[in-house]
């Protein structure tokens, strides 16, 4: 017997009742007219693929899910509280069945199912808001005089909906495959024992002042250009763009060289655009806590602090990240050490020529992509004394 089921063991149906709790799910009244704008209801039905049919209680009961669990799922997905209005469809029932079924089958714990609902709801809510705003942005004037915004929106959604739905599923599958591949590769790679991510913040300088000076459209274009540039630089690498916050982006990678390269390329790309303000980047190395696609912890806080104290158009890194670059041969411990390595290589070549051997037989000259310059030590609230390093790109090999 499902939650709210009022039938007895005799199989007789209960008497009709005005209470929604007494309405069996197979006797849903389809004659009740919604009080909302009929055209808006048509648009909603187009998007949802079905007409309004169930109250929340009826949907939960039809799905065989307790009202308490259904409510928690809906709250997690950030659905509006509609009371017991008849506003849900067959798709809502099916979604409840599927999510609850994963819990019953032991594939997900109940807290994990709630988390899945919340992360999916938050991600798609932002995507939906962005898409509808973008599609309707240019429709300030109706195609024909007297047309309402709903009348303008309906044919546009009718054309776009099936294509966008297929595209969304395609992109999600590609991203899922990429994320799964990274996890599997990390588990199989014996050398990658330490999976502490390198976390980077990139922050536009003087963004608050810009918000007062620029028009809304100009500000939007600037933010979009910044986010697009960051995403384009991160996408081809093994790094991941965690989130964008207007004037700030957060991305993470497991390889120190990749992290440093992205940071410097971002500085270089932004400095070539005269319309963009200066950029500051902070990188920290350490463990992080991941939750619903976001990252938290001391490493993230340190990267953020380094960004706030970095010079304009510069990259500051913490000591742990600097050691990683040195350990992997991406940067010398110091410029003096790099000069000694070059001098030693030159001496090996000289001795080889003196002995009649080919210099190519000698060990190659050290190749350093990056240079590190120690900066001033300073106390950072909650993190103690921090000694940042200024990251820069070195010139030609061995220089």
Curated annotation (Swiss-Prot):
InterPro entries: A/G_cyclase (IPR001054), Adenylyl/Guanylyl_Cyclase_3/4 (IPR050697), Nucleotide_cyclase (IPR029787). Residues 24-33 have a biased composition (Basic and acidic residues). Keywords: ATP-binding, cAMP biosynthesis, Lyase, Magnesium, Metal-binding, Nucleotide-binding. GO terms for molecular function: adenylate cyclase activity; ATP binding; metal ion binding. GO terms for biological process: cAMP biosynthetic process; intracellular signal transduction. It comes from the Bacteria. Its EC number is 4.6.1.1. Its cofactor is Mg(2+). SUPFAM superfamilies: Nucleotide cyclase (SSF55073). Mg(2+) binds at residues 203, 247. Residues 198-307 form the Guanylate cyclase domain. The keyword Magnesium applies. Gene3D superfamilies: Nucleotide cyclase (3.30.70.1230). It catalyses: ATP = 3',5'-cyclic AMP + diphosphate. Coiled coil: none annotated. Binds 1 Mg(2+) ion per subunit. Pfam families: Guanylate_cyc. Signal peptide: none annotated. Residues 1-10 have a biased composition (Polar residues). CDD domains: CHD. Residues 1-35 are annotated as: Disordered. PROSITE patterns: GUANYLATE_CYCLASE_2 (PS50125). Belongs to the adenylyl cyclase class-3 family. This is Adenylate cyclase. It comes from Streptomyces griseus. The gene is cya.
